[in-house]
Regions:
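Surface-exposed cleft-lining segments at the edges of enzyme active sites
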Residues: 181-192, 251
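Catalytic alpha-helical scaffold of carbohydrate-active enzymes acting on polysaccharides/glycoconjugates
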Residues: 1-118, 123-177, 194-286
Length: 286
């Protein structure tokens, strides 16, 4: 059976959405909800052979809940970096990016007691046409998993353009059929796909020379809306924007969450979980 890789972008959605919307710069994280979501992920992995996985964690979690990062590392998972805050790197100067990256890496290394060698940009947004951000990244980590593409050739071409070199672990993104919108192998896309569409994308990834690799988030493994912002928290946005964001959150916290574990289990009937990314750089990195 071929391998299917699973990685988690480990972030507190409620904290990060409020920051994106300008409601706060930072505030206490929902550590109990993060812990419950981690435990749901761990139960899923244990029920499917006990493979270990890679958790791309925001630095703020390591700052506020170092014991949770230590536990994830102690249970055998790879701790990788998902920036300090969940900010869009394409909106940051190289200097701001460098400062946030170093802050995140030092918090994650201290909390996990592990080397932290992998990185994924929040929302996969990191400038790919300008080299400054990747040059900085290559000084601090061994691999990046922020590149979306539909062929191994595209990933190799991008990887070859980087100096200093950095290993690229791409995420497959393509149209499941002609004229359909481009979809990624993970997140909301995976929740909304039918099982057949997900299986088709996994097959297409393999045919394109890319080891199938699904990314998911803690809030997708729970269906209790524990990462949703309340109407009261959204109220400072004004009635119209608050109502919009309150409704919009269903996309992340409600629609398809209950059926996700069964869908993943069904996909795993034809695959085995691939394990930590840092232990599989040879099949994955281009
Ligand atoms: Zn993220």
């Amino acid at each position: 059976m071929s391998k299917l890789f699973l990685s988690i972008d480990f972030e507190d959605f409620s904290h990060d959405l409020g920051r994106d919307l300008g409601l706060w710069e930072t505030r206490p994280l929902r550590i109990a909800a993060l812990t419950r979501a981690y435990e749901a992920i761990e139960r899923f992995l244990q029920a499917h052979g006990g493979a270990r996985a890679t958790f791309f964690c925001t630095g703020i979690i390591a700052e506020q809940a170092p014991e949770l990062i230590a536990r994830i590392a102690a249970e055998g998972h790879e701790i990788a970096c998902h920036h300090h805050f969940h900010d869009c790197i394409d909106q940051e100067t190289p200097e701001a990016f460098a400062a946030n990256l170093q802050k995140a890496l030092s918090a994650l290394r201290a909390a996990s007691g592990q080397p932290v060698t992998g990185f994924r940009a929040p929302k996969f947004r990191i400038p790919q046409s300008r080299s400054a951000h990747y040059t900085l990244l290559a000084k601090h980590v061994e691999y990046d998993s922020s590149y979306l593409c539909n062929s191994a050739e595209a990933a190799r071409h991008f990887s070859a353009s980087l100096a200093p070199p950095l290993k690229i672990l791409p995420i497959f993104a393509a149209r499941p059929r002609a004229l359909a919108p481009k979809m990624r192998l993970g997140g909301t896309y995976l929740k909304l796909f039918s099982r057949a569409t997900a299986a088709r994308l996994i097959k297409a990834s393999t045919q394109a020379g890319l080891a199938p690799h699904i990314y998911l988030h803690p809030y997708e493994f729970v269906a209790d809306q524990s990462f949703a912002l309340s109407r009261a928290e959204l109220a400072p946005l004004g009635p119209a924007r608050a109502a919009y964001w309150h409704a919009r959150q269903s996309q992340w916290h409600k629609i398809g969450n209950r059926s996700l574990p069964q869908k993943l289990s069904a996909l795993l009937q034809n695959h085995t979980l691939g394990g930590r990314l840092d232990e599989n750089l040879t099949p994955l990195a281009l």
